[in-house]
């Protein structure tokens, strides 16, 4: 692992979110760098972070780059974590603000930008996935556009894309990830879910492991990484059935029989309960293998894994194990 080089000033957006809080914590603990946090509500910054003499907090709407760019000072590295999840805000934050901040670094001598995309916009080989642009939600389409535009700036500044898969994380004072919230919500229904099996394959990753990789890439030489630098973050792929079995084993459940939820049965359930599917939902139903040929975790960079298995992640988000 490279030792942190000269002290840097690092801009972080989205610092009060799930991944953002782990990232700030990681950088303060493992590097000498100073952090500039652009946050709308400084009250959401943990007190120990806000009181650190290495942290500068700028109260601002991240999408209003013109309104705060003159207060940024020298920025060596930007970690663009903030996300707009839907509506016009998705494009204002995910595209416009991220590109404006990248351009600001280019004009003012910045060295590196790490932006956050999503695994949904690339295929198993890391190529851009056209259906994501055509069928995706506003969030997914905006992330697709971000990748297209920000990679054009790679000749002027180091550009590294981080593409998390399903994110576990939260608890102990940190905001829950969407996936963690979903698992907590389905926990009371595990007695029913235990009887079903389904096709599919995917990755998951803990937010702290995302933070470790991002922290490493702040200082590491980038030559070993293939271009374009699209770093898919995840544990080894698991099938849907393996995930269900691990979840049930953690809860101490062992079903006496199982029913495979094939596409015809799924369609019947959708019609019975009048479930509304978006074009992207329908696409994902038809393309259930969401695994990638090359994924990265802290172990790939010589760092310890925080969450090497599902049981560790479930315990951390507060799902009690059944004794």
List the predicted regions and their residue ranges.
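N-terminal Rossmann NAD(P)H-binding glycine-rich loop of SDR-like oxidoreductase domains
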Residues: 8-33
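A conserved pocket-lining segment of Rossmann-fold NAD(P)-dependent short-chain dehydrogenase/reductase
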Residues: 184-205, 216
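Substrate-binding strand-loop-helix patch
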Residues: 201-208, 229-250, 263-268, 308
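Terminal hydrophobic/aromatic helix or amphipathic segment near a protein terminus
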Residues: 244-293
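Amphipathic terminal alpha-helices
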Residues: 291-323
């Amino acid at each position: 692992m490279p030792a942190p080089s000269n002290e840097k000033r690092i801009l972080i957006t989205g610092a009060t979110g799930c991944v953002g809080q782990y990232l700030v914590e990681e950088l303060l603990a493992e590097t000498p760098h100073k952090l500039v946090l652009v946050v709308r509500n400084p009250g959401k910054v943990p007190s120990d972070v806000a009181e650190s003499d290495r942290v500068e907090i700028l109260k601002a709407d991240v999408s209003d780059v013109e309104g705060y760019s003159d207060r940024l000072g020298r920025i060596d590295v930007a970690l663009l974590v903030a996300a707009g999840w839907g509506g016009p805000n998705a494009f204002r934050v995910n595209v416009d603000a991220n590109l404006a901040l990248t351009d600001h670094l280019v004009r003012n001598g910045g060295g590196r930008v790490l932006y956050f995309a999503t695994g949904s916009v690339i295929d198993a080989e890391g190529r851009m996935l056209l259906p994501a642009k055509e069928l995706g939600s506003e969030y997914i389409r905006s992330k697709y556009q971000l990748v297209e535009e920000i990679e054009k700036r790679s000749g002027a500044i180091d550009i590294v894309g981080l593409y998390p898969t399903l994110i576990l994380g939260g608890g102990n004072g940190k905001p829950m990830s969407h996936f963690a919230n979903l698992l907590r919500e389905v926990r009371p229904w595990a007695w029913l879910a235990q009887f079903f099996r389904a096709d599919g394959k995917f990755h998951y990753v803990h937010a702290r492991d995302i933070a470790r990789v991002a922290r490493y890439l702040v200082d590491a030489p980038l030559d070993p990484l293939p271009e374009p630098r699209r770093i898919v973050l995840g544990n080894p792929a698991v099938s849907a059935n393996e995930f269900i079995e691990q979840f049930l084993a953690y809860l101490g459940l062992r079903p006496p029989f199982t029913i495979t939820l094939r596409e015809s049965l799924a369609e019947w359930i959708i019609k019975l309960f009048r479930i509304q599917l978006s074009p992207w939902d329908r696409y994902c139903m038809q393309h259930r293998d969401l695994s990638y040929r090359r994924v990265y975790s802290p172990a790939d960079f010589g760092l310890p894994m925080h969450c090497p298995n599902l049981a560790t992640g479930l315990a951390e988000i507060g799902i009690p194990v059944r004794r």
